[in-house]
Amino acid sequence: MPSITLTAGPIARAKNGVIGKDGTLPWRLKTDLANFRAVTMGKPVIMGRKTWDSLPRKPLVGRTNIVLSRDGSFEPKGAVVCEEFGEAVSIAREQAEEDGAREVCVIGGASLFDLALAKAGRIYLTDIDADVEGDVTLTPLDETRWREVSARAYPAGEDDDYPFTIRVLERR
């Protein structure tokens, strides 16, 4: 049986490390959102409560949604709730195996990315070529621990506020 890879992301970050502002994404990048959907479709996704709350439509269709929350009364429709990251990863891996998926995606927020980066085998990272104002930042990534396996650059345009590069990194 193939192993199930834990991934950090897809995650988009500005040059200054910003990943969010006021509970939303501080940019409009339709091309990146399409990539997010393509990468996560059919795979379990793990997110924190604030990320869940920020979703315009809940749950994310076609994916098992797992939400971390310490609030015992939190019962989101269409999601599994876990109190601990390890428990969420175990449940997600079991679900991935059942679904025939080969990855589990940790999709946010910042503290969950920090937890995921310690164990992830792959990172789906969108680097936005701009400094953006925001109130949530990603811990700087030590890229010496990772090797880039793909990168594709996109220009700013009608559907995308800024130029950006979608990258895939794998642990060395």
Predicted regions and their residues:
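Flexible, gly/pro- and Lys/Arg-enriched active-site loops
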Residues: 2-172
